[in-house]
């Protein structure tokens, strides 16, 4: 948020974990006022569990509830959740409809183009989600079968936006890893914005770089070594304040020794 993100979402949270009062899931509901507007993202495939999760989430007073229908990871998909629900669009629509009905907050959806190349029906799916009341849809430009291979197909996302029936905001996700690509998303494809994930890992400055370029094509310099070190120290302090010394230090060390952190440290 400090570096320009307009809206933030939490790490996705299992609806089953929430209703079992799993400590790890409950901890992810923590919201700091300086983060607003912030959405809490949940996943699941059982209607009763999802509705109970909505009640729990609303008690923490977020600004938005987001449903993750896009995670391609096997342990999520095998339970029919995340991108797994793309094999059962009627269930996807039913879950969404009931969550909208039972929530006082805006409900948004994150999803993918389809389960595989032969089942891409994102234009129809987006219409149905809009019809049951979602406030916005973010679409990752790959199928579940692709995982993160190949290139995100932004043109298929643009087809959703260009559908004259669509009135809600449509956001692109996937491979938006430069300010120039963000400009294409907005100015050439006419989408309402971008949901950025992997490009910001270890690089929180990315949001302000994108916003400066979208405003007048200003190219902001990459952060200096001093700024990077200060950011790392800040991350460590916040992690310790949030999760305690042992877990905070461990998770921060894991972050900064990951492949994503290697990319960040090399600029």
Model-found features: residue ranges?
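Glycine-rich, positively charged N-terminal anion/phosphate-binding segment
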Residues: 1-63
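Hydrophobic faces of well-ordered beta-strands that scaffold small-molecule active sites
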Residues: 8-10, 38-42, 65, 107-111, ...
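Active-site beta-loop-alpha junctions enriched in small/polar residues
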Residues: 13-15, 43-45, 70-72, 112-116, ...
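Catalytic cores of alpha/beta
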Residues: 50-56, 120-125, 176-193
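Alpha/beta enzyme core
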Residues: 54-65, 69, 74, 79, ...
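Glycine-rich phosphate-binding active-site loops on the catalytic face of alpha/beta enzymes
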Residues: 141, 191-207
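C-terminal helical cap(s) of enzyme catalytic domains, especially alpha/beta-barrels
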Residues: 203-219
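Single conserved hydrophobic/aromatic residue that forms the stacking wall/gate
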Residues: 259-267
């Amino acid at each position: 948020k400090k570096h320009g993100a307009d809206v933030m979402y939490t790490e996705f949270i299992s609806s089953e974990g929430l209703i079992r009062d799993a400590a790890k899931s409950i901890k992810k509901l923590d919201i700091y006022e300086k983060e607003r507007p912030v959405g809490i993202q949940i996943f699941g495939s059982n209607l009763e569990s999802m509705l109970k999760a909505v009640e729990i989430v609303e008690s923490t007073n977020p600004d938005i509830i987001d449903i993750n229908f896009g995670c391609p990871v096997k342990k999520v998909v095998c339970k029919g959740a995340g991108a797994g629900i793309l094999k059962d669009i009627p269930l996807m629509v039913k879950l969404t409809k009931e969550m909208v009905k039972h929530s006082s907050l805006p409900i948004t959806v994150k999803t993918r183009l389809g389960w595989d190349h032969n089942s891409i029906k994102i234009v129809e799916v987006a219409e149905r989600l809009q019809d049951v009341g979602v406030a916005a849809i973010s679409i990752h430009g790959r199928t579940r079968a692709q995982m993160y291979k190949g290139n995100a197909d932004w043109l298929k996302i643009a087809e959703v936006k260009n559908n004259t029936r669509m009135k809600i905001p449509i956001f692109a996700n996937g491979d938006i890893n430069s300010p120039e690509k963000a400009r294409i998303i907005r100015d050439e494809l006419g989408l309402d914005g971008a949901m950025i994930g992997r490009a910001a890992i270890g690089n929180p400055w990315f949001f302000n770089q994108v916003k400066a370029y979208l405003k007048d094509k200003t190219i902001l310099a990459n952060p200096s070594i001093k700024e990077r070190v200060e950011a790392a120290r800040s991350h460590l302090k916040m992690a310790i304040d949030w999760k305690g010394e042992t877990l905070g230090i461990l998770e921060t060390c894991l972050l900064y020794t990951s492949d994503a952190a290697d990319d960040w440290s090399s600029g």
